[in-house]
A protein has these predicted regions:
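NTP/phosphate- and nucleic-acid-binding module
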Residues: 1-539
């Protein structure tokens, strides 16, 4: 049994995730996230926000899952969000044409045309996995779930294929909320839907999935991106080294300055993503960024890099994509709606300064000369302000600066988008946490993912021990811990169950606990134990 199969079996048995609708035979492309999976998913989301949202003061929204057809027609998805579908002439089974070819050892790219795939399938007599026939018809298949909004058949809608369009259509309101300033980052975490022809590879290709996306709106003439790291090295398999097949190790700063990356924000997000995925437990050597070439990238993108993680069984697998969407989306929605989706920037060209006297102070200070001072024109000299030849103190006047001339500039901001597949990240996190010790399964999840999870175990099922264990459980929960309570079975078997589930710490309540209040705390990875007071965990 390979590692991925073991991980998938463990994920189901320990409540992380499993195929949905199994009592009905299952439906490919749908997975249920279990109790432990939901907990880890939320912690991955929070970690992502700590890398991508909070440090820059970005905003977060939650838009509807259903979109009017008009929105997705304007965005280009209705015309372009399609995959090549091959239909068997004998049995009618349908598959992704490019997947059929690659499974037969015939490599194609995303730029390979429908006609070319049709020829390759038929000329190479690729067999139908269902009936063995070798005659195919290939056509485009729209990857969006269609629905009606309300009772009218002509009011068509789609389940969103990405959360991004829910951000773009709200740009005008969000810009006002952000007081007209760019750069402006808008994040959204939610579900996406893609009516995949033939979903496979467990959590990798789903029909309903979780996404974490961020749209960064910026001035293309002045990006104002954060400082880029000059020391860390990113493995970039970019266009210039694609033929060699080996990534170039280069800093985010160097990649931008050398023109490999078209945007400083794009470089910044790749840097953040590399560190974020490392924090999930994926080693540097098992990560890379690969550039999508012309004909491969999405219709809205001027440059795209995929962040890939290596699985022994599946090879390099995308977990995130970074698209330089420029002004494509905002211009498309502006054209369709007639709305002006722009940033208005006012720049002062010149100002005029005027000196206004505080007549009350002048009268109080200059009882003899105040009339001549007030009737004269203030004069600015190197050492101060004078009126009628008399130098005034600072409380006798104020200088008012007024805009004399300003320049108004309107521009459609450019967009850089980091987009993460949350389900894929969950799988990668568990995959790289999975290991064995003395023949036992251990899920060594990082502390940033399960650090605030602990098990409380009464050594034996005695009333006083159980009561004390519940008391400790309540104290820990009050302090923000997620607590698992388990009193069934031998203590060694309970430890093994917890190790396999990834629970980092286990507290055992025993006879000594009833005497002095101390408990045994056991570490999942080292199996070391020591006695502490439960309150020590709150420090």
């Amino acid at each position: 049994m390979d590692k991925l199969t073991e991980v998938l079996n463990l994920a189901k048995s320990k409540g992380y995730f499993w195929p949905s609708y199994e009592i009905y035979g299952g439906v490919s492309g749908f997975y249920t996230i279990g109790p432990m999976g939901s907990l880890v998913l939320k912690n991955i989301e929070d970690l992502w926000k700590s890398y991508f949202v909070r440090p820059n003061g970005f905003l977060e929204i939650d838009s509807p899952d259903i979109m009017p057809a008009r929105v997705l027609k304007a965005s280009g998805h209705v015309d372009n969000f399609k995959d090549p579908m091959a239909e068997c002439a004998k049995c009618g089974s349908k598959y992704r044409a490019d997947h059929l070819l690659s499974d037969s050892g015939i490599q194609v790219s995303e730029s390979t045309s429908i006609n070319q795939m049709n020829e390759l399938l038929n000329q190479n007599k690729v067999k139908c996995p269902n009936c063995g026939a070798t005659t195919w018809t290939v056509k485009q298949f729209l990857n969006m779930f269609e629905t009606n909004i309300g009772p009218y058949a002509d009011n068509k809608g789609y389940l969103r294929p990405e959360t991004a369009q829910g951000i773009f259509v709200e740009f005008k309101t969000l810009l006002d909320i952000n007081r007209g300033k760019v750069p402006m980052g808008i994040a959204q975490i939610g579900r996406g839907y893609r009516n995949e022809i033939s979903p496979r590879q467990s959590m990798i290709r789903l029909r309903e999935f979780h996404m974490m996306e961020l749209e960064l709106f910026m001035d293309p003439e002045d990006e104002k991106a954060p400082a880029l790291d000059r020391d860390m090295k990113l493995p970039l398999l970019h266009e210039k080294v694609m033929e060699k097949g080996e990534p170039e190790l280069i800093s985010p700063y160097g990649a931008y300055k050398n023109g490999i990356l078209k945007s400083a924000w794009l470089a910044y997000f790749l840097e953040k993503s590399f560190k974020f995925v490392m924090a999930l437990g994926v080693p540097e050597s098992k990560q890379r960024f690969i550039e999508k070439l012309v004909g491969e990238r999405a219709h809205y993108s001027a440059q795209t890099f995929d962040h890939e993680v290596f699985f022994d069984e599946m090879g390099w697998t995308e977990v995130a994509g970074f698209a330089y969407r420029t002004d494509y989306d905002l211009k498309s929605h502006a054209k369709e709606t007639g709305q002006e989706l722009v940033v208005i920037e006012k720049k002062t060209i010149s100002t005029r300064k005027t000196i206004k006297l505080n007549e009350k102070e002048v009268k109080n200070t200059h009882k003899k000369d105040w009339e001549s001072i007030i009737s004269s024109v203030p004069e600015s000299r190197e050492d101060g302000i004078y009126c009628a030849g008399i130098k005034l103190s600072s409380n006798e006047y104020k200088i008012i600066e007024e805009v004399e001339k300003e320049e108004v500039r309107k521009f459609v901001p450019y967009v850089v988008e980091p987009s993460f597949g949350l389900d894929r990240l969950l799988l990668a996190t568990i995959y790289y946490a999975y290991g064995k010790k003395d023949g036992r399964n251990i899920l060594s999840l990082p502390d940033v993912i399960l650090g605030k999870v602990v098990a409380v175990l009464p050594l034996v099922s005695k009333k006083d021990m159980i009561e004390k264990a519940f008391e400790i459980k309540a104290m820990l929960e009050k302090s923000g811990y997620f607590v698992i309570f388990d009193e069934k079975g031998y203590i060694g078997k309970r430890y093994a169950r917890l190790d396999e589930a990834g629970i980092p710490k286990a507290i055992t309540v025993d006879g000594q606990t009833l005497e002095d209040g101390t408990v045994t705390i056991r570490d999942r990875d080292t199996w070391n134990q020591k006695r502490i007071r439960p309150s020590d965990l709150l420090v």
